[in-house]
């Protein structure tokens, strides 16, 4: 309680310095914490955090919700326009590289990846695992991984040494704070090219750390929060300093590229698990967003998967595989187009030749992301030779947790190579496709196709749209439109199904 509002600046600075000694997390560090804010501005900021000006009660909001709030702001930046300071989308968000992953997907992916490595292990073994998200954003995957690692340890103690645990509300148990700190600092790592996202990820993990803690439970800790500077890093996980050595890279370009020194992580033999939702950025957007040297000299020359009109997530998959230890797990949610399109050839070959595909959840044309048209799949790789993988076809997110709604089939690794993957859960149809492949000749033996349908092309109107002015006739079952001096009949049922009418 600061009664004299004219002393807000000085008193808050004292409080922050005391908090820095107590919490030791870097949140309150620095000689000029409040910079040049005056008392009136500080008062407005503080009042804005509490009722009635704020609709939120921050003491009861879930930690992951705080991360989501911050993630919303990560997509915008202050900019000067017509003499006014305005908020506008960052250029990478305009180009779809920032996508918020639904909670159910995050939980499923973390559970799937960690189950492989945590099952049957003791807490001492679990605390040796190294888990990373190399495009971590606000840290939602790392938060969920932190929760899952704790849960695995709690389950082990419940069976083997219940006295080690601390009871909390609802008949539940938790790990002691010091052991949670140990898991956080030993096991979890993240990198992001957005410096603000890095700070949000650190903050979210620290909030997660003190979840279910009380004043008595933290009283024994001299330093309540750990410093996460050795866990969450700012940088470009796709570009090492060594990749730029000998190149004529301008200082400004190097600042934009933000090369990352992987030695800072002190992870000697690779990660046990890498998971997340890497950026989706097509080649044309990369040319608008990134320095030319980064694309032409690093991506195109250092990565095998940078083939033709490649997408950025291709090289994220390649990079992640290279950073796994032998037997390590990679779990990514990515567009499913790479199964089939020409530019995915080298990525398909990389996965198929090494026989590392463990499972593939394919959502077909079901849409999982708000306000984004993305045809998604969940890719699980294990960096050791596999004999077969599980292919699943799903209509929605709920099917992930419901075996009866999940169409799946076991497929031999020998069935896939760098050619487009012909995957279906219909065994008879798969055999038919195999037979056609064996006896038929591809159309490319007869004609040269410059471009097919541009599935991701930018156009003001999709090709299946038409306006009332184009309709020249109508029957009970179809519309007839005229376009480019030709008439086309379109069945009404197709339109009804397309728009779920």
Across the structure, where does each feature detected by a protein language model lie?
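Short glycine-biased active-site loop of nucleotidyltransferases that positions the nucleotide triphosphate
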Residues: 368-373
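C-terminal substrate-recognition regions of SAM-dependent nucleic acid methyltransferases
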Residues: 41, 269, 323-325, 342, ...
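Generic amphipathic alpha-helical segments used as scaffolds and interaction surfaces in large
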Residues: 3, 28-36, 52-60, 92-101, ...
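Alpha-helix initiation and N-capping motif
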Residues: 5, 9, 39-43, 63-66, ...
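Non-catalytic, mostly N-terminal accessory regions of nucleic-acid modification and defense proteins
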Residues: 1-104, 108, 115-117, 206-209, ...
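SAM-dependent methyltransferase catalytic region
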Residues: 56, 84-360, 365, 378, ...
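Residues that form generic nucleotide/phosphate-binding pockets
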Residues: 11, 15-18, 44, 48, ...
